[in-house]
Regions:
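Long, positively charged binding patches that form subdomain-scale interaction surfaces
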Residues: 169-249
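Active-site- and interface-proximal helix/loop "cap" or "latch" segments in soluble metabolic
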Residues: 2-190, 240-344
């Protein structure tokens, strides 16, 4: 497994959705989590001309201990989002989001993509604490009896959540026997922005030491005729910046597939594991083909409900859920009026 060395060129007649969520703790590793998130939709015309059809931003502060949302500022502004203040950015957050701003998911907005991805980004940000040594005095070190789950319980984890956390996988065995979560070290993160394409990604600020970045790219390719399949090409990466300014990959997947028809039914889907922390993790890629035959409009709900357990991966699931926006993006390819495009 190797990380992607760069980003592919933008095919003429395509639309590209990119997003990034940076998580940092400027007040120290035990301090609050500051989140900076950006997203953009970019259409590439047949002559190669690039045009921005939508942008969104958010800045948030999350309590470093309770994970409660302390502040949230978004562009575009949505007053209803004030009701999320005090909500734990974890289990239940997406359900609360759907209750307060249901239309954002319905229209596949960029802002919804960022908000929906906050729980995953906040969860993964804990890796920075581990790398920085901030968890060492919090982890119980006594080994548990063979076959016991006491060590896992003490660390607040439950086995069989995903392929990497399966009961007999490296992660859980180490927790049971050593009373500590093992630390994975990923490869250096190649720069994804090709020097010959300034439009390949939206602008992102420099990543601070001990910060993490979650970035996504979704390319929807032109169909060859009305109601024929749109190809999709997807990339996902979690990365960490260490104290010395070296960025490494924590998780990385690529996904390819096809979506066909007015309702956007999945006709092909395959995932590739590029970088994953444990040797058991790549087994989850086989779960991607479960989406074949599904309408993409149902993916966000269906994947969250049905794709659970040791044959799946939380991060791959979120990548597959984001395909729920494909039909909305595909409609922009045939829409010459930027004011009607879905990105804002």
């Amino acid at each position: 497994m190797d990380p992607a060395p760069t980003t592919p060129s933008r095919p003429p007649g395509s639309i590209r959705r990119t997003s990034s969520i940076d998580t940092a703790r400027p007040d120290g590793l035990r301090g609050d989590l500051f989140i900076t998130a950006r997203a953009r939709d970019l259409r590439t015309d047949l002559d190669g001309t690039a045009s921005v059809v939508g942008e969104a931003e958010l800045d948030a502060r999350v309590d470093g201990t309770t994970r409660e949302l302390r502040s949230l500022v978004t562009m575009p502004a949505l007053p209803a989002l004030d009701l999320l203040i005090g909500t734990v950015v974890g289990p239940g957050f997406r359900r609360r989001l759907a209750d307060e701003v249901p239309r954002e998911q319905e229209v596949g907005s960029l802002l919804h993509l960022l908000l929906d991805d906050l729980p995953g980004a906040a969860l993964v940000s804990g890796y920075a604490l581990q790398r920085g040594g901030a968890l060492e005095d919090l982890e119980p070190r006594a080994a548990s009896p063979e076959g016991s789950t006491a060590g896992a319980a003490a660390l607040g984890v439950r086995d069989d959540l995903c392929a990497g956390w399966a009961h007999d996988a490296t992660m859980m065995v180490t927790i049971r026997t050593r009373g500590a979560i093992p630390m994975a070290m990923g490869p250096p993160a190649p720069i994804l922005e090709p020097p010959d394409d300034p439009w390949s990604w939206h602008e992102m600020p420099p990543l601070a030491p001990h910060a993490m970045r979650r970035r996504r790219r979704l390319d929807v390719l032109p169909s060859t005729a009305p109601e024929t399949a749109h190809g999709v090409d997807v990339h996902f990466r979690d990365s960490h910046m260490d104290a010395d300014g070296a960025e490494s990959v924590v998780h990385e997947y690529s996904v390819s597939g096809a979506v066909e028809g007015v309702e956007g039914r999945v006709t092909a889907m395959a995932a590739r594991a590029r970088v994953l922390p444990w040797m058991e993790c790549p087994a989850a890629v086989a779960s991607a083909d479960r989406l074949i035959g599904m309408p993409v409009g149902e993916l966000r709900t269906w994947v969250r409900r049905e794709m659970t357990g040791a044959s799946t991966c939380t991060h791959l699931n979120d990548t597959l859920r984001a395909l729920g926006d494909v039909t909305v993006l595909a409609s922009a390819l045939d829409n010459t009026d930027a004011g009607d495009t879905p990105g804002v």
